[in-house]
Amino acid sequence: MRIALVSDWYYPKIGGVASHMHHLALKLKERGHEVAIVTNNRKTGKEKELEEKEIDIIKIPGVVSPIIEVNVSYSLKSTKELNGFLKAFDVIHSHHAFTPLALKAAKAGRNMNKATLLTTHSISFAHESKLWEALGLTFPVFSKYLRYPHKIIAVSRAARAFIEHFTDTPIEVIPNGVDDKLFTPNWDKEELKAQFGIEGKVVLYVSRMSYRKGPHVLLNAFSKIEDATLIMVGAGELLPFLKAQAKFLGIEDRVKFMGYVESATLPRIFGMADVFVLPSITAEAFEIVILEAMASGLPVVATNVGGIPEIIRESESGLLVPPGNELELRNAIEKLLLDDDLREWLGNNGRKAVEEKYSWDKVVEQIEKTYEEVLSIM
């Protein structure tokens, strides 16, 4: 098959959509398909890797928003250019609903009688009331565009429940994937801790430093926990506040803020951790970072919001707590730090779940099958 993966939200935009598209492209290429990534005209930092893998990258010029770092509009000329590129493909697969390029590609694909799909990665609109108000008048337009795909893929049941408000297009749930060969439990924890200058148990947080991810809640909970180090990986608007918060709580010596970390380094950081924590305040459709922790054999403490309970089975691969509840978060972390057998059991279960359901090989098989099903009705 000749497959175009289309989205404004590709690199250098950091996040789950970009990661998903990139790994999907690589795996589809491995399976013998011709693949191209169609995105905006910013430098992605992935050009060399894609060239080496013989994956084309097609850039469509548009107006880039300085706030969300993606294209927010396209000229008539750019739209015609997009349509011209897409003619060469059998499958048009857009990513991230409610973004201009994805919706334009869905319309173009349907009008050209191509197998047209859209993956929805988010439910965050449902938790931004001001955004609801601002976009209220344009939701009918979005609903119209969401009728163009032959099928919508949702990364979780939570994402499906959200997108169902706007379309009656058939929806299939196919989760995100993780590279289970890159993220593994086969590290020497003590050796890695020594390399990073850390002793004792390690609690790990990897995500954006923003309010909705709950890092401030984690700091408050961790301040009551003794004999452990908290590693916080990620950048974001809350980072200066969090550093001041750690100092105020008197735990700055036990909290290491590592900022943004290159993806090649992340497996080693997961490899030295004992417990992974993601205390999200608001709902997320799907957290790839939880899969990375599970693939690394780590027990996970997370909040029971959005699609997270679909990944973490309570007391089987991790522990779930209510969002914003510092006491229950602290108790869950302490429970794991104090019980070596429980940590190992939960970590092993998480790794097994990844191998059975969430490895990229498993996920791409499902997506490929969906392509074939849509092509069969053309």
Kindly give the residue locations of the regions a language model identified.
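Short hydrophobic beta-strand element within catalytic cores of glycosyltransferases
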Residues: 299-302, 312
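A short, well-ordered alpha-helix in the C-terminal region of glycosyltransferases
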Residues: 328, 335, 342-357, 366-369
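Nucleotide-sugar donor phosphate/pyrophosphate-binding loop at the beta->alpha transition
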Residues: 115, 125-144, 161
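A conserved mid-protein helix/loop that constitutes part of the nucleotide-sugar donor-binding site
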Residues: 19, 23, 201-224, 237-243, ...
